[in-house]
Amino acid sequence: SDVYKRQNQEFVPPYGTGATLYLRPLLIGVGENIGVAPAPEYLFIIFCMPVGSYFKGELAPTNFIVSDYDRAAPNGTGAAKVGGNYAASLLPGYEAHERNFSDCIYLDPETHTKIEEVGSANFFGITAENEFVTPKSPSILPSITKYSLLYLADHALGLTPVEGDVYVDQLDRFVEAGACGTAAVISPIGGIQNGESFHVFYSETEVGPKTRALYDELTGIQFGERKAPAGWIFDVPLD
């Protein structure tokens, strides 16, 4: 990947713009078969694109809605980054946007009582007892952003990192909440619509202090403004 970055160095955004060079590996079946079967041949691509800051203005909370749809099936492909998982979220996401919500909150497909993921990102909540809580499920896509935040919550903010069940009827245990992923790093959640009820966390207009601190810490590391834990940063010579 270092060679690839050097070959595309002209697309690296200038420091200070908040923009980044986004790299996405893709594996596509291209073999000559039309049946439902693994492809006999694959094409590996690294998609490279400069992207601007996810937020057009300041970091700000938005509202989400609990979906009646299932994102992934039990014992299915929920933990893999495959196109089918995203296809299942297109209609629910469209309907959420039509109702002026940023995205959907998906529950576990077996009991529909536990939060699993937020659209294309992971969910987290922060309790009044200073716990940083994320759902734990075999249907959740592993996220380097989530694991980075779990580490920083502990080592930088002194929060207690917890991976476990997050019941949708117990949202009042959280004083702050958000979604986390590669693109936005953190998307603060102002409130969640669940059926007829609407739960507000810290605020619908202001970012919670611990969410802000986590965002500043991780983005500061990414842009070389704060000290990174050992092994997190790799220098890529561009000359």
What residue ranges belong to the model's regions?
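Short, small-residue-biased leader/transition segments that mark boundaries at the very start
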Residues: 2-4
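Active-site helix/loop of acyl-thioester processing domains in fatty-acid/polyketide metabolism
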Residues: 8-9, 153
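Active-site loop segments of alpha/beta catalytic cores
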Residues: 9-13, 37
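Extended, Lys/Arg-enriched charged tracts that mediate electrostatic binding to polyanionic substrates
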Residues: 13-28
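Helix-start/capping segments and mature chain N-termini
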Residues: 26, 33-239
